[in-house]
UniProtKB/Swiss-Prot annotation:
Name of protein: Large ribosomal subunit protein bL35
Family note: Belongs to the bacterial ribosomal protein bL35 family.
Highest taxon of source: Bacteria
Alphabetical keyword list: Ribonucleoprotein, Ribosomal protein
Molecular functions per Gene Ontology: structural constituent of ribosome
Segments for region (Disordered): 1-28
Xref: Pfam families: Ribosomal_L35p (PF01632)
Basic residues compositional bias, start-end: 1-22
GO CC, any one term: cytosolic large ribosomal subunit
Annotated coiled-coil segments of the chain: none
Amino acid sequence: MPKMKSHTGMGKRVRVTGKGKIVKQQAGLRHNLEKKSSTRTRRLTGLVEVAKPDVKRIKKLLGR
């Protein structure tokens, strides 16, 4: 039986931490930033943990 391939698109969107948590970049920080307040753009920076209901599906796509 061949090896399972991880989902390339999902691999580019999320990262697995050392403890096994799945983190992602928040949406809304690519364009149209001029109309968004500094507070809002600052709040959107950094990585956030993926919502619990999605974790099982994402781990399956990543082959974990």
